[in-house]
């Protein structure tokens, strides 16, 4: 087998929407980096059972609506 074919697997801090920080193993970033979530199981309507506002942090929903505005969706 080839050596060094797998990415580095290390511990990072994941910051939830409510501010709590959980340590997880990941290949993202480097040891000790912090990943901040925009949405997580405690705030997602699929897991909370409620209807929540739609988060458009990347502008993807707005871009989609503008692109297909003339189709009457």
From Swiss-Prot:
Cross-referenced PANTHER family: 50S RIBOSOMAL PROTEIN L31, CHLOROPLASTIC, LARGE RIBOSOMAL SUBUNIT PROTEIN BL31A
Organism: Roseobacter denitrificans (strain ATCC 33942 / OCh 114) (Erythrobacter sp. (strain OCh 114))
Alphabetical list of Pfam families matching this protein: Ribosomal_L31
Subunit structure: Part of the 50S ribosomal subunit.
Family membership: Belongs to the bacterial ribosomal protein bL31 family. Type A subfamily.
Gene Ontology annotations for the cellular component aspect, listed alphabetically: ribonucleoprotein complex; ribosome
Role played: Binds the 23S rRNA.
Name of the protein in question: Large ribosomal subunit protein bL31
GO MF assignments: rRNA binding; structural constituent of ribosome
Encoding gene per record: rpmE
PROSITE patterns to which the protein is assigned, alphabetical: RIBOSOMAL_L31
Biological process per Gene Ontology, one example term: translation
Keyword field: Ribonucleoprotein, Ribosomal protein, RNA-binding, rRNA-binding
């Amino acid at each position: 087998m080839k050596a060094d074919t797998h990415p580095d697997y290390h511990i990072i801090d994941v910051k939830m929407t409510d501010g709590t920080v959980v340590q997880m193993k990941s290949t993202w970033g480097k040891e000790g980096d912090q990943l901040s979530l925009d949405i997580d199981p405690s705030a997602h309507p699929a897991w909370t059972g409620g209807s929540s506002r739609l988060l458009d942090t990347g502008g993807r929903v707005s871009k989609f609506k503008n692109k297909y505005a003339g189709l009457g969706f």
